[in-house]
Amino acid sequence: MAVITDSLNAKTVLDLIGEERTVVVRRDKEWKPGELVEFYNELGKVIQQNDKVTGTIGNGELVKVRQNGLFAGKEDGELEWHSAGMNRTGHDDIVAMYMHQTAESGGDTYFTDHQRAWDDLDEETKNICRSVKSKTVTYTSKMKLEKMHYKNVFSDERTMMEFRDIDGKTSFEKQTPRKDLVTNHPINNKEGLYYPWSVIRGFTGLDRDQQHSLYYKLKNHTLQEKYIYMHKWERNDIVLSDQHHSLHRRDAYTGDRELWRAGICLR
């Protein structure tokens, strides 16, 4: 994790995201929606949602994350471990989070580092990981939202079916049953685990016992405290979160917490 309090040079920020996975921008100022979008566009291309998606701001680059909105999570506000692209082809490279209004209590966010976790694995496990693909959960449009993992992400089925990637295609139509478990990061080209374990149900090329063993070995390994950063939000904080070698989750909270989310794709 890195903290920036002064220069917002785009190359410096991107390099930090590649090396640290999580970058906190902390300045004593309120950001207007247009200022945020301008800053984010220096880092890449901001994904634009249409007005059918619940809680869009301005031209759709920013989406409100709050109770009864997008990424609302459970009834108490907890949102389990996830990343932007979990079971689809192509996804945001960076998720930008701006804290417009903090919670009365709770709402801390946790970020994992799957690049450092990968570095610490033994070579035998690394070679196994390189040789397999993850088997990911996919859903059909006939299924009810409450039966899907997406129930913690989308507030309603229309938003689920309309949420789009940078190419204009909906996230729902880009689902895939297989994903690489090991990827090279687009910023620093280093290997790391692409491991959104909540939507993974096994691995290709391994028998059932081997799949079970590898799944829990990687899950327990990546969730060690030394690979997790906990962020306690202050008003006007920006957190830039890598979506290749990291997951994030949110604690339960009370109060009228409102965060503005944006998805950024590298140019």
Describe these PLM feature segments.
Residues 2-235, 244-267:
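Non-heme Fe(II) oxygenase catalytic core, chiefly the N-lobe of the double-stranded beta-helix
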